[in-house]
Regions:
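Conserved P-loop/Walker A NTP-binding site and adjacent catalytic elements of P-loop NTPases
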Residues: 37, 42-173
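Helicase-associated low-complexity/disordered flanking segments
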Residues: 1-43, 59-74
């Protein structure tokens, strides 16, 4: 099949999965407002109650805004949507939840990387990880160029890793 957007010598990109937003979640009701803020600003802080959908819906919203590898145009460097969680169990369970909501296998569109476990394919667009994993990546990718979007979840917990990470991000922005 000859696609006009195909880059010679590369495999065709898989299509974006159907993305839906549960109407019962407050973040779903405010997604247009959040999307406008993300388009207009380099840094956006989203606050909401526990259970409002921030953790599971924001990565999906970023996909609809054209972020992540699945949205990369031909000749454009494909980058990830990075999403940190303070704990390994949270990173893996959130990745599974988002993959389930997208009706895709874990690792295909959404995966995770934690200490001793990496459940990401090369085609994945959303990478859940601990904040320690992202901090470690600054050693080999100081400008974090592997990412076009970073979601620092649970930043209010103010762990040493999160504080270092937020300070580091402030310096490179």
């Amino acid at each position: 099949m000859n696609r006009p957007d195909a880059v010679p010598g590369t495999a065709p990109r898989p299509p974006l999965p159907e993305i839906t937003f549960p109407e019962a979640l407050p973040v779903s009701a405010r997604r247009d407002e959040i999307a406008a803020a993300v388009r207009a600003h380099q840094v956006v802080i989203v606050c909401g109650e526990t259970g409002s959908g921030k953790t599971t819906q924001l990565p999906k919203l970023m996909l609809t805004l054209g972020r992540g590898k699945l949205n990369a145009r031909p000749g454009q460097r494909a980058r990830l949507i990075g999403h940190t969680q303070p704990r390994r169990i949270a990173a893996s369970s959130v990745a599974k939840r988002i993959a389930d909501e997208l009706k895709t296998p874990l690792g295909a569109v959404v995966g995770y990387k934690v200490r001793f476990q990496d459940r990401l394919t090369r085609e994945a667009s959303v990478k859940l990880m601990t904040d320690g994993i992202l901090l470690a990546e600054t050693q080999t990718d100081p400008l974090l160029e592997a990412y076009d979007t970073l979601i620092i979840d649970e930043a209010h917990e103010r762990s040493l890793n999160i504080d270092f990470l937020l300070g580091y991000l402030k310096q490179i922005l």
